[in-house]
Amino acid sequence: MKLIRILIPLLLLAGTSYVISSCSKEKTNSRLSVYLTDAPGAYDAVNIDIVKVQIKASSDQGDDGWQELPVNAGIYNLLEFKNGMDTLLSSIELPAGRISQLRLILGGNNTIVLNGSTFELPLETPSAQTSGLKFNIHADLVGGAEYKMWIDFDCARSIVVTGNTSYKLKPVIRTFTEALSGAIKGNVQPAAAQATVYAISGTDSLSAIPDAVTGDFLIRGVPAGTWNVVADGNNGYLDQTVSGVAVTLGHVSVVDTITLTP
C-alpha cells in the first residue's frame, strides 16, 4: 500500500500549497506539508493556542472520518512567522489517496499584546474549540510526491474590538498552494517609512509588512493575474504604486525596490 507523509509546519501571512518531489527511491511515500502563516496586524504579539490538527479523507460532510495528526501543540505568536519563516507542527505517513478537508482546533489561551499590555482573546465562535475550523482541500496525494499547504491567518481581520480594552478572536483564514498560486517579492525603503505593502487586483487585496531592518517583503498565495503593488507609507512618507505586476502560477514575481519620499 502506498503511503503519504504529512508534514505540518507553521508560517506567517498567506494559505495552502503543493510541491512535487521524490520522497523515496521506490516512490512509495508522499509528503503533505501544512504551514500556518499570517497577514499583518498592528499588534506587538498575537498568541494563538493550537490544540489539534485533523484531516479527513472522505467527502462526507458529517463529523465522522476525521484523523488526528501528531501535532506539536502549544501557543504560537503569529507575528514571529512572516516573510517565509515557518515551523514544523506535524509529520505523518498516510495511505495514498484523496484528502478532502483539514481541521484546525484552537484552545482557549489566546492573547494579544498591544502597547506592552496583554489582553485575553476569547473565541467569538466557541465551535473553533470543539468542531474546529474546517478547510476544503480536495487533494489527490500520489506516492513519491511532496505536497505543501499554507493556512493564512489574517490577524488584522481576525481580532474584533469589543470595548476600550476588550477583544475577541473571530478567525479569518484562507488557504493556498504553490501549484495554484504565485508570489510577489520586493523591497521598500527607507525603514523609517514603516510601510505596509498591498497587492491589489479588483476587489481582492493581500498584504505584507516589510522586514523592519532590510525592507524585504514577500506575499504568498497570489492568484495568477495582473496586480498593482502599493507601498502605504507612514510617518509622513507618501504612498507609491507599482502597476501591472504579472503573477503566474508557481512563480515568484520580483518588484524593483520601492523608495518612498516624504
Question: Model-derived features: where do they sit?
Answer:
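Hydrophobic alpha-helical membrane-embedded or membrane-associated segments
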Residues: 10-13
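A short, solvent-exposed, low-complexity linear motif enriched for acidic/polar residues
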Residues: 24-244, 249, 255-262
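C-terminal motif of bacterial Sec signal peptides marking the signal peptidase cleavage site
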Residues: 18-22
